[in-house]
Amino acid sequence: MTSNVQLSETNSPRNQKTRPRAEKEEVDYMQRAQWLRAALLGANDGLVTVASLMMGVGSIKEDVKAMLLVGFAGLVAGACSMAIGEFVSVCTQRDIETAQMKRAIEHKTSLSAIDEQEEEEKKERLPNPGQAAIASALAFSVGAAMPLLGAVFIENHKVRMVVVAVVATIALVVFGVTGAVLGKTSVVKSSVRVVIGGWMAMALTFGLTKFIGSAAMQI
């Protein structure tokens, strides 16, 4: 008798309404987390790319204009590349999900009002390629602007190089901590990973550019 009452309660209209709502809230939360992680990765890419370019140019030229021009060119090129790549990727994902939804509808002989509402909600939750492209470009630009702003007002070359490295390191730590909080992982491990990766990129760009630049000048 008790089990029948419990079954009737779980199958009641009120519980059936609250379940989709809870599932929708969970999906919305997951989508927000994915957007935040994507923005974080884009900003990290922009930071490491432009800081590495500036360090590479700074290894062979002390002119602040050259560093800033190369950094700005890297910002524009990287933001455009990220936007185009994200747009194409999201368009492909949207096409695949739309095709799957059409096939699912074709398999059903008749759709109830609830099914139609669910299909409409699924269509509304499909990613927007334009929004994804703009968000990716903005995230990359924010990260790329940090080393540029750190170097723009410093005339001394050595101090400028140190400031770029310090600004990049601080930003990498912030990105690592934020990523760990979003992913609920170890803050220390995530921060160390991100910082070491950024340092390696800057060091390799600095070393290889200096080596090739010095060899080219001797020819």
Swiss-Prot record:
* Record keyword Transmembrane present: yes
What Gene Ontology terms describe what this protein does at the molecular function level?
iron ion transmembrane transporter activity; manganese ion transmembrane transporter activity
Chain segments carrying region Disordered = 1-26
- Describe the inactivation phenotype: No visible phenotype under normal growth condition, but decreased accumulation of iron in the root when grown under high iron concentration.
Q: Where is the composition biased (Polar residues)?
A: 1-15
Q: Which residues lie on this side of the membrane: Cytoplasmic?
A: 2-37, 89-133, 183-193
The answer on whether this UniProt entry bears the keyword Iron reads: yes
Pfam family membership, one: VIT1
This protein is called what?
A: Vacuolar iron transporter homolog 2.1
Q: In which organism is this protein found? A: Arabidopsis thaliana
Q: Which gene encodes it?
A: VTL5
